[in-house]
Amino acid sequence: MKIAVDAMGGDFAPLEIVKGIEIARDRYDDIDFQLYGTASEVKPLVTNWERIELIPTTEVIEMGDEPVKAMRRKKDSSMVRAALAVKEGHADALFSAGNTGALLSSAIFLVGRIKGVDRPALATALPSFEGEHDQFVFMDLGANADSKPAHLYQYGILGSFYASHVLGIQSPTVRLLNNGAEEDKGDEVHKVAHQLMKNAPSFNFLGNIEARELLEGTADVVVADGFSGNAALKATEGTALMMLKQIKAAIMDSGTRGKMGGALLKPAFKSIQKKLDYNEAGGAVILGVKAPVVKTHGSAKATAVANTMGQIKTMIDQHLVSDIQNYIDTHTEELQAGKEALNAQINA
Amino acid sequence: MKIAVDAMGGDFAPLEIVKGIEIARDRYDDIDFQLYGTASEVKPLVTNWERIELIPTTEVIEMGDEPVKAMRRKKDSSMVRAALAVKEGHADALFSAGNTGALLSSAIFLVGRIKGVDRPALATALPSFEGEHDQFVFMDLGANADSKPAHLYQYGILGSFYASHVLGIQSPTVRLLNNGAEEDKGDEVHKVAHQLMKNAPSFNFLGNIEARELLEGTADVVVADGFSGNAALKATEGTALMMLKQIKAAIMDSGTRGKMGGALLKPAFKSIQKKLDYNEAGGAVILGVKAPVVKTHGSAKATAVANTMGQIKTMIDQHLVSDIQNYIDTHTEELQAGKEALNAQINA
């Protein structure tokens, strides 16, 4: 298999990207890598060219660039060229640590939507602290700020495929992030989405979940509209970071006694931090497009990049995209029926 | 001043409510309390009737009751009777630890909206860990699942009044919870709200805030639509609780060494937990109605109830409601102009 790598995206690109790719090359012997990037910067960093090919590009999409504009105008950027390679069948998957919006645009407009998927969405695996499994799929993380009920329904399908194919969870359960457990809770979008999902033949819906229970692991897939999904994810990250910071500060403030305690607890803290640092395990995936497209956080170092290659390999090995495609192709009536039920409800 | 107390609402009602009121009575010598509740249950709990009056009621709104229905049907419930006392001028403020939705309905339909406020909303003070002040106002916590831009604009006004009058923050700053820092981020509602707020003569708008920075204290008031505000608040609470739980578990798992460390760090953990437990400091306030209406969490114990009386006293002492009322009365043109600008934008 071949992975097209945007070598220029990310805070520590191209250095950490190239280092990560070399680790992955040594780890997975069936992956070939195409590095898209500025030759003068990337070339000196590669120590061993085995299964690594450099495709020189002349432009870079910056973190601050306006996504759609950047994708349209920077035609010789590392990201756009890597996306086009996937589109044209020269590579099987796309990886970037760069501008998320531009990667989304590249995924949707260049790699292309799977026919029948209305809105590709961003998904990630988060730690599930008390559930049956170690992780759950959370989506949409913010690809679509304005989600409709039919989109949320489709996220249930896409998320279930990711949970089964990549996290290895048999018949995954699905919940809808809402501001109450009862089915009449939420705004119109979530009320209607709940009704659609309740009768879903395509996945195993358990009902609503409130953001307070997110990390408890009461479902294998949690579906959210992109706006509140983004808010819940970021509030979770922000709170976890703030607490670790506060604990460190409290330890430093508490004199010899506290510092001794802190030293003794170091291994315990490390294990929690590791569990929380879900970014190390891989990236956010754009589900609903014609190939695996994965984004790691901008500050990803080599290890995270290498781990993400493992995640992409699993997606390819498990035929995630073709299985989604086949499912949607053979269930157009169900998806259509969902939309009609929806329209009937809205016009009632 | 007189506070009407729903003595029957909350997981530990009426015991902890009555205990809390007695603590508050001893602490604040200018407050009279009216306890609305089932006589046979409340009467035996009161140890000293000084400045405490029992108004017997025969019904109780339960946590699981459908809010509007319960408010309409249970006319002799402790909550409805307490709300009516405020409406009729027999009391200055309303307190309950009961059904939040029913309290919202009672506040809006019985106590009544301030003329000119389109949507009363739920606000709370959260800890600000790195800001200039210790706390900031976060609203709407979920009173309105479907918020319009003009509502978010009004929350900016209401929140600023709460920050100045109750938290004592001079010329408070305001931010809008959105899924990106740039002004073109978010769905239509948040894009338009940002434009309205940017030109706000009524408050000091600093721009968007992402949920990740919520606890950092970069603003004195954070305005959110009720749906994502609810999600962000609950994700914050859930993550904080989960982390404390995980730390405890990691300490227990880490042998003698870890347990010793945990024992040494106990005071440090206590101080963080106290800072995080914003519920102890008071309740969530329904802003935009004609009197202070405050809800503490259902599991509130006596201390939290007593502290909430202090919060209500500040609201009354500082003339929060009449100052909001006066401001809105004298700025109808501005509020109207905001709506017109909005309509122009929407129809453009």
Curated annotation (Swiss-Prot), chains A, B:
Pathway: Lipid metabolism; phospholipid metabolism
Family: Belongs to the PlsX family.
Main location: cytoplasm
One GO MF term attached to the UniProt entry: phosphate:acyl-[acyl carrier protein] acyltransferase activity
EC top class named in words: transferase
Annotated HAMAP family: PlsX (MF_00019)
Stored PANTHER family: FATTY ACID/PHOSPHOLIPID SYNTHESIS PROTEIN PLSX (PTHR30100), PHOSPHATE ACYLTRANSFERASE (PTHR30100:SF1)
Keywords: Cytoplasm, Lipid biosynthesis, Lipid metabolism, Phospholipid biosynthesis, Phospholipid metabolism, Transferase
Gene designation: plsX
Protein name: Phosphate acyltransferase
Organism, scientific name: Leuconostoc citreum (strain KM20)
